[in-house]
């Protein structure tokens, strides 16, 4: 038995260098083998990787190594999502240029990623801040512009007053900027937008084809796209109360059945009718100015107190000319959704009910639950939004909701006002066009020029890329490109007159919406993609990343791929065939008595009579053990990957990340379990070394036959191989590791038997050791390479083909059945797999436990559930 410990610090850099020297992870575009494209979402170069990165990239690496061993041409690239605000903040705070800060961070993080032992094709490395990348992004912007998929429009935007930039609705969290945390304001600005709404229905319908995506992600996208079927209704306005020139108010509703429960109309502060009314009412104008400050995001609207201002305007009910409804300007109605106007039916909408209760407008229920007396059915503080029959609705009374919807639609469609129907069935989507303009320096410049004579002029393709100036300064708030003395001043390419560059840069989500396509041929200097190559390598077979990107990044990428198809860059619609969302790495939090957090490395944990106790290492003071939460710098519950790799090695970190819980769930960091992973590494190392000694008696050729011991070991080895193969393909990595541990235990028991093994068993030991090393090689590649050499194998295990499963060995000779008497378990019986029912029955009835349970009673019948249970009924 070997007494030498496995030395990860010596082994891991050596094997990483060997992989690089042989370039075994470099994918060739002309490789004739079937392709497999695995990609983890590329990181932002913040300066250091965190432990979540280790988990994310290890998951993808296991799959990449496995598929390479299975004979695929694996594309497994890496790059950097390198534009963004932190670089500008660093420029301001640390007086360092964003470019220098970013590339220094890339170098540091690349070194860290290499230390994990990832099988990455670094020859395809890209950084989105490099002109060689964003040149092609600018080219596609111009292609989209020509195709009508990009345009400039004036629109209400979410303005972050701290970062001084526009935010998409998705980037506003609880009314605050997603990076700065500042309260978001509403402003009207010229914005460049991508016309994602042209694909609303297609993006929605295609979700049904993505059967290798998590259901929760598809549901989130469905909800965000937000398809709704309803009725556009034209309410006439009472001319005696309405500003000149206004005659009707259009609303879109998904509940036309509730029209007879209407108590008010509400319009957005940006609605033309509100503007017209405010022109003659200073108090209304003041109210509108106040509510505009809260922003345009739905999250803000939902949490704000419901406020309204009665304009004095009255709308006429479409089924009763004498019924007039007050028109309010309300802070919960957005111009961007529907028509910017609603009718309020408070009895059946909680928001509307809260509003009428505040302004004493009353409510009339028009849908009554089945079985309830309509006369006694009232609404007070809780709206009823369930099913039922129509009441208080004149000609609709007694109908179901769906019948009433259809009846209202038919009547209003047949009624004309000014040659147009009063009602029209429509489909609406919640999805809005993607505003990409950002008032920031460190982003991809938008390649257009503003000329006072020619208006907006695209930068000629020959002049791309439009590069960022390296000498920008950040001593003023706002966009450094605006402040630059020369960069924005140019000559118009059409008329030759003085003009200015667009100083907005693109939303960084644009950068990450097509990088996966660039990876297929990053050497093409003339076009974003080489279509023949991209069409062969795409879609990505397995994409891996956090669920926090389920809406923004994934939806934008799906749109971008369609836009690239429309402009000739790719030939597919969906970029990601398979999507996997990994869980987070979480950790306990630790706090002093004053509430301040301390790092795990500063805490000593002891087990006592009252459970776990934590103390501060430096002072011995008691520390409160808090909740298990997502790792964050603010709560100091982070673990530095470098420390773990330095102490235990990368393979231990990788094994722990894979073994503790299913990969789609959070994994709780545990020093004890990390130490357990380290012990398992040493155990494998000893086991492989021991197997070499015991395998020396093995004949060079495979024996013609195997005895019982050798057959049992071979069954265990090939059974483990079959299970691990299946579970890797299912991405059930924690289950794979459990099977490897199970086989390790069985193999260890064989190796510990006294004496020298017979020749056939020695051959089986040698085979089993090779299979074992290959089983854990995707998870612990450095240890596997070291063991591969110990076994005397040629080449690298990273180049070896995956072992072939001998399926004859998977057939069990016997099966163990649970034995019951009158439904209660009395024991077990093992019989031949091929045994017939009479043989099974005889074996069961011969058991002493069965005879004792029957206590002399006659057997009435024996029920046999094949390969599971035998129940004796007495």
UniProtKB/Swiss-Prot annotation:
Name the Gene Ontology molecular function terms of this record.
aminoacyl-tRNA deacylase activity; ATP binding; leucine-tRNA ligase activity
Q: Where is the signal peptide?
A: none
Motif annotated as 'HIGH' region, chain positions:
43-53
Q: What positions does the entry give for ATP binding?
A: 633
Has the keyword Lipid metabolism been applied to this entry? no
Enzyme Commission identifier(s) = 6.1.1.4
GO CC annotations? cytosol
| One GO term of the biological process aspect | leucyl-tRNA aminoacylation
Which keywords are on file for this protein? Answer: Aminoacyl-tRNA synthetase, ATP-binding, Cytoplasm, Ligase, Nucleotide-binding, Protein biosynthesis
Does the keyword Cell inner membrane belong to this entry?
no
Known CDD domains for this protein?
Answer: Anticodon_Ia_Leu_BEm, LeuRS_core
> Coordinates of motif 'KMSKS' region in the sequence?
630-634
- Source organism's superkingdom? Bacteria
HAMAP family hit by this protein: Leu_tRNA_synth_B (MF_00049_B)
Looking up NCBIfam families in the UniProt record yields: leuS_bact
Q: Which family does it belong to?
A: Belongs to the class-I aminoacyl-tRNA synthetase family.
Protein name (database record): Leucine--tRNA ligase
Native species of this protein?
Bradyrhizobium diazoefficiens (strain JCM 10833 / BCRC 13528 / IAM 13628 / NBRC 14792 / USDA 110)
Lineage of the native species?
A: Bacteria, Pseudomonadati, Pseudomonadota, Alphaproteobacteria, Hyphomicrobiales
């Amino acid at each position: 038995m070997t007494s030498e410990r496995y030395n990860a610090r010596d082994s891991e850099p050596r094997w990483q260098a060997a992989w690089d020297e042989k370039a075994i992870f470099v994918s060739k575009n002309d490789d004739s083998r079937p392709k497999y494209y695995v990609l983890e979402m590329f990181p932002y170069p913040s300066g250091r990787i965190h432990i979540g990165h280790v988990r994310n990239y290890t998951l993808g690496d296991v799959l990449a190594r496995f598929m390479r061993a299975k004979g695929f041409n694996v594309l497994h690239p890496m790059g950097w999502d390198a534009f963004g605000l932190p670089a500008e903040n660093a420029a301001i705070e640390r007086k360092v240029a964003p470019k220098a800060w970013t590339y220094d961070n890339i170098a540091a993080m690349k070194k860290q990623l290499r230390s994990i032992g990832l099988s990455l094709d670094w020859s395809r490395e890209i950084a989105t801040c490099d002109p060689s990348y964003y040149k092609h992004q600018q080219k596609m912007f111009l292609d989209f512009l020509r195709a009508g998929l990009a345009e400039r429009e004036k629109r209400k935007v979410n303005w972050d007053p701290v970062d001084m930039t526009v935010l998409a609705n998705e980037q506003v969290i609880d009314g605050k900027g997603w990076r700065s945390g500042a309260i978001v304001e509403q402003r009207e600005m010229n914005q460049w937008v991508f016309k994602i709404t042209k694909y609303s229905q297609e993006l929605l319908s295609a979700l049904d084809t993505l059967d290798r995506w998590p259901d929760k992600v598809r549901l989130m996208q469905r909800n965000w796209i937000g398809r709704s079927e309803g009725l556009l209704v034209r309410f006439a306005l009472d001319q005696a109360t309405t500003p000149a020139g206004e005659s009707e108010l259009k609303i879109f509703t998904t509940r036309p059945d509730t029209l007879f429960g209407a108590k008010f109309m509400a319009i957005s502060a940006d609605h033309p009718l509100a503007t017209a009314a405010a022109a003659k009412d200073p108090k209304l104008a003041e109210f509108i100015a106040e509510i505009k400050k809260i922003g345009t995001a739905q999250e803000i609207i939902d949490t704000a107190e419901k406020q309204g201002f009665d304009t004095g305007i009255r709308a006429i009910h479409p089924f009763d000319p004498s019924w007039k409804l007050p028109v309010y300007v309300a802070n919960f109605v957005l111009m961007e959704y529907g028509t910017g106007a609603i009718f309020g039916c408070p009895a059946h909408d909680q928001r509307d009910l809260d509003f009428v209760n505040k302004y004493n407008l009353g409510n009339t229920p028009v849908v009554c639950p089945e079985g309830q007396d309509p006369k006694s059915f009232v609404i007070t503080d809780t709206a009823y939004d369930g099913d039922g029959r129509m009441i208080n609705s004149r000609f609709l009374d007694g109908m179901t909701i769906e019948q009433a919807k259809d009846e209202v639609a038919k009547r209003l469609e047949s009624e004309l006002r000014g040659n147009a129907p009063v009602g029209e069935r429509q489909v609406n989507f919640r999805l809005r066009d993607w505003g990409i303009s950002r008032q920031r320096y460190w982003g991809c410049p938008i390649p257009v020029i503003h000329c006072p004579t020619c208006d907006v002029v695209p930068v000629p393709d020959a002049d791309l890329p439009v590069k960022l100036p390296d000498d920008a300064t950040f001593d003023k708030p706002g966009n450094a490109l605006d402040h630059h003395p020369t960069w924005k001043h140019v000559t118009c390419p059409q008329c030759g007159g003085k003009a200015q560059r667009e100083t907005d840069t693109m939303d960084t989500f644009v950068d990450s919406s097509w990088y996966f396509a660039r990876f297929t041929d990053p050497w093409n200097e003339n076009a974003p993609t080489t279509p023949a190559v991209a069409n062969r390598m795409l879609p990505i077979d397995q994409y891996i990343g956090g669920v926090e990107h389920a809406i923004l990044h994934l939806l934008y990428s799906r749109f971008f791929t369609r836009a690239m198809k429309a402009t000739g860059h790719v030939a597919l619609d969906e970029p990601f065939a398979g999507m996997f969302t990994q869980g987070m790495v979480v950790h306990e939090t630790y706090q002093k008595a004053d509430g301040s957090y301390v790092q795990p490395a500063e805490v000593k944990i002891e087990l006592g009579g009252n459970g776990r106790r934590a103390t501060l290492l430096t002072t011995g003071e008691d520390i409160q053990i808090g909740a298990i939460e997502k790792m964050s710098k603010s709560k100091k519950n982070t673990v530095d990957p470098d420390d773990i790799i330095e102490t235990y090695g990368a393979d231990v970190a990788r094994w722990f990340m894979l073994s503790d819980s299913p990969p789609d769930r959070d994994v709780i960091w545990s020093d004890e379990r990390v130490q357990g992973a380290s012990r398992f590494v040493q155990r494998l190392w000893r086991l492989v070394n021991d197997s070499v000694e015991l395998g020396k008696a093995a004949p060079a050729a495979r024996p013609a036959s195997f005895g019982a011991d050798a057959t049992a070991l071979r069954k265990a080895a090939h059974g483990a191989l079959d299970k691990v193969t299946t579970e890797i393909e299912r991405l059930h990595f924690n289950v794979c590791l459990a099977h490897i541990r199970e086989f390790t235990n069985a193999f260890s028991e064989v190796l510990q038997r006294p004496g020298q093994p017979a020749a056939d068993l020695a051959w089986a030991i040698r085979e089993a050791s090779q299979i074992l090393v290959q089983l854990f090689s995707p998870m612990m590649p450095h240890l596997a390479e070291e063991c591969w050499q110990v076994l005397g194998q040629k080449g690298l295990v990273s180049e070896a083909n995956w072992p072939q499963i001998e399926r004859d060995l998977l057939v069990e000779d016997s099966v163990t059945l649970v034995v019951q008497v009158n439904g209660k378990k009395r024991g077990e019986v093992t019989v031949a797999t091929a045994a017939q029912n009479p043989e099974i029955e005889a074996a069961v009835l011969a058991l002493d436990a069965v005879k004792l349970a029957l206590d002399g009673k006659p057997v009435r019948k024996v029920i046999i559930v094949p390969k599971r249970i035998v129940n004796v009924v007495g």
